[in-house]
């Protein structure tokens, strides 16, 4: 239900990014908090290890949440589900035949030729169907470009099997932890211009303990942050890594892929398309992508950590014009759904980060005194504590779920 960011800004600090805002008596708790900002909004980041989205042993879909999923198992599951509706050809593309600015056909390694009106390029950074695409580099706005990733087994499942993702800031970057039923997916994100891959592997294995993971078990992932200026180009639509990538923080890669898929579905729902639709698609994607870049960049905007990596971040950090405007307007008008930047992340996400990074936020215009606001917040927190006391732990739920 949240992402936990320990040691961001400075060691010992904690930042929480819940997936929803808290409401009590039909009043948004963020609005009340804006009247009494001395009361820490961090108290609403639930580090207690219970699962708040469970209702009668099922997922309560009325509460925003995320899944910790084994990607390989998910791919197998989807493939099994669609096999009667979609023709699956398991082969590699060896030749892309083009006519002017469009793809005419694909020749596969198994000898099959594929002809289509519209092609979706999900071939990753290589972008086999549109390798000469015009790209927009983000190297001057982002700070990491490499990760080493692996799997660790639980040592203390009750402490480590959390109902949230962790992004732990460390001296050379940050470490993600994604606990699933049987193990923890984890990786170290860093800048290879500052830290070598071998040094990063050594740091990462020391972090977890070499009895849990060793350098030979780690996969190296490289990228250059960028986005495709025209992801819909002719009759090719680039989706996923072929359209752009920021970095692993906040899972924007998956979110952007889903956004593209839904936008494409919207544009071709009548089984027709033209240059106007493709240009609108490209414009909407660029605006959405830029909003994600600004939100991720915000995470790095204030740091007092002094290691070489974090000093590089603070020395080279630049606010985009858009991010500067968001910060400035938030100090004049409290961000709400009707008065906040459009994009992947709602007003609540911006509030949680801006407030916990101690950017100035305006008071919301609600009819309540500062004294009443404090009483309201204390009462709300008491309610949360009462609810948490009645919930089963995340680990208990997973054990129960395995038996049903």
Report each predicted region and the residues it spans.
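Dinucleotide-binding Rossmann-like beta1-alpha1 core, especially the glycine-rich loop
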Residues: 1-52
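Extended, composition-driven regions rather than compact fold-specific motifs
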Residues: 20, 43, 48-54, 58, ...
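General small-molecule cofactor/ligand-binding pocket signal
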Residues: 87-89, 216-219, 237
């Amino acid at each position: 239900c949240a992402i936990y960011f320990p040691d961001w800004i400075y060691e010992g600090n904690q930042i929480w990014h819940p997936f929803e805002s808290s409401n009590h008596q039909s009043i948004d708790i963020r609005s009340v908090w804006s009247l009494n900002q001395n009361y820490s909004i961090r108290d609403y980041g639930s580090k207690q290890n219970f699962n708040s989205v469970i209702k009668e042993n099922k997922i309560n879909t009325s509460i925003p949440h995320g899944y910790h999923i084994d990607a390989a198992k998910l791919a197998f599951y989807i493939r099994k589900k669609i096999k009667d509706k979609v023709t699956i050809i398991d082969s590699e593309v060896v030749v892309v035949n083009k006519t002017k600015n469009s793809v005419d056909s694909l020749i596969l390694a198994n000898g099959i030729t594929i002809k289509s009106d519209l092609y979706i390029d999900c071939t990753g950074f290589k972008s086999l169907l549109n390798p000469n695409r015009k790209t927009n580099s983000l190297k001057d706005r982002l700070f990491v470009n490499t990760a080493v990733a692996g799997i660790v087994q639980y040592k203390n499942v009750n402490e480590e099997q959390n109902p949230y993702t962790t992004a732990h800031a460390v001296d050379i970057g940050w470490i993600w932890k994604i606990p699933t039923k049987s193990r923890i997916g984890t990786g170290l994100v860093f800048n290879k211009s500052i830290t070598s891959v071998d040094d990063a592997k050594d740091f990462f294995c020391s972090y977890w303990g070499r009895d849990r993971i060793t350098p030979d078990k780690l996969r190296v992932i490289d990228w250059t942050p960028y986005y495709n200026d025209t992801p819909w180009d002719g009759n090719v639509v680039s989706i996923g890594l072929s359209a752009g990538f920021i970095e692993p923080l906040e899972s924007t890669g998956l979110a952007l892929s889903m956004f593209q898929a839904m936008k494409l579905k919207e544009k071709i729902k009548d089984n027709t398309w033209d240059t106007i639709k493709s240009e609108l698609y490209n414009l909407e994607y660029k605006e959405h992508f830029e909003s994600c870049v600004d939100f991720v960049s915000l995470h790095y905007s204030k740091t007092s950590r002094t290691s070489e990596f974090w000093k590089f971040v603070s020395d080279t950090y630049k606010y985009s014009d858009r991010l500067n405007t968001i910060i400035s307007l938030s100090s004049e008008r409290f961000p709400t759904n009707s008065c906040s930047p459009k994009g992947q992340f709602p007003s609540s996400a911006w509030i949680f980060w801006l407030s916990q990074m101690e950017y100035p936020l305006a008071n919301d215009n609600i009819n309540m005194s500062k004294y009443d606001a404090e009483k309201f917040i204390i009462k709300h927190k008491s309610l949360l504590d009462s609810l948490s006391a009645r919930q089963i732990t995340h680990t208990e739920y997973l054990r129960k779920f395995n038996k049903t």
